[in-house]
Regions:
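Extracytoplasmic small-molecule ligand-binding "clamshell" domains
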Residues: 25-92, 100, 158, 234
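Alpha-to-beta junction loops
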Residues: 29, 64-65, 81-90, 133-134, ...
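Extended ligand-binding regions for polar small-molecule ligands
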Residues: 52-61, 121, 128, 139-142, ...
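Short helix-initiation/N-cap motifs at beta->coil->alpha
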Residues: 67-78, 122, 157-171, 182, ...
């Protein structure tokens, strides 16, 4: 009888341990800034936006519990490298440098790099007009990289911010900022700040989800990619886009 009790107890302990592992494996940690309207932002103490809705759908389809981890954009890749998050969902652009380090999901947003100036500014129409000007970008963002790539002779005074550079442009403290076309249109509409887009986007960008190149993360990437494919096929991804942008930015 004692042996039977020990056997059952041992099996119960093993089952509990395995169950605990399974529960842990069903959580995916997604890093984002929570400061990039309307992709990821906080309103009335609630994290929301296009990226949040997309991940809630991915969670439902994969069976994973999605845990959002917010931090300044400049710290997100460090969190990915150290395993504090499984991926980053913050309009991450695929670049050659990033492809060498990370595995990427299929693109889920197609957009462009857009210059924004104070309303009434008629001197800036494109990237060449930024020479000699002070231009803001998010620290460590895709747009900082793009702007520096387009300024090989360092004629642009590039200022890096964690957030809220639109206020400085609206007040005339700096000349312009660079962000994605879709977000700038929504920002101008919702904030009522005296801002305007300057010319057409100067570069096309594709946004994707980066994962570490380990077997565990590759398996996770496959499940996320399958969910994105299904969402594209049944129209769920398009519907989320239309909710936030009144347009489909998920297709070329």
């Amino acid at each position: 009888m004692t042996s039977s009790i020990k056997l059952v107890s041992g099996a119960a302990i093993l089952l509990a341990a395995l169950s605990g592992q399974a529960i842990a494996q069903e959580t995916i940690k997604v890093g984002m800034s929570g400061k990039y309207f309307p992709f990821t932002f906080v309103k009335q103490d609630k994290l929301q936006g296009f990226e949040v809705d997309m991940w809630n759908q991915i969670g439902e389809r994969t069976g994973y519990k999605v845990e959002f981890v917010t931090a300044s954009f400049s710290g997100l890749f460090g969190m990915l490298e150290t395993g504090r998050v499984d991926t980053i969902s913050n309009q991450i652009t695929i670049t050659d440098e990033r492809k060498a380090k990370y595995a990427f999901s299929q693109p889920y947003v197609y957009d462009g790099a857009q210059i924004v100036v104070r309303k009434g500014n008629s001197t800036i129409h494109g990237i060449k007009d930024l020479e000699g000007k002070t231009v803001a970008v998010n620290l460590g963002s895709n747009f900082e990289e793009l702007l520096r790539k387009n300024d090989p002779n360092k004629k642009i005074d590039i200022r890096t911010y964690d957030s809220s550079f639109e206020q400085d442009v609206a007040l005339g403290r700096i000349d312009a900022f660079v962000m994605d076309r879709v977000s700038t249109a929504q920002l101008i509409k919702e904030s009522k700040l005296p801002l305007q887009q300057a010319g057409a986007p100067f570069e096309t960008i594709e946004n994707s989800l980066p994962f570490l190149k380990t077997p565990e993360k590759q398996a996770l990437l496959k499940k996320v990619d399958d969910a994105l494919t299904a969402m594209r096929k049944d129209g769920a991804l398009r519907q989320i886009s239309e909710k936030w942008f009144a347009a489909d930015i998920t297709d070329k």
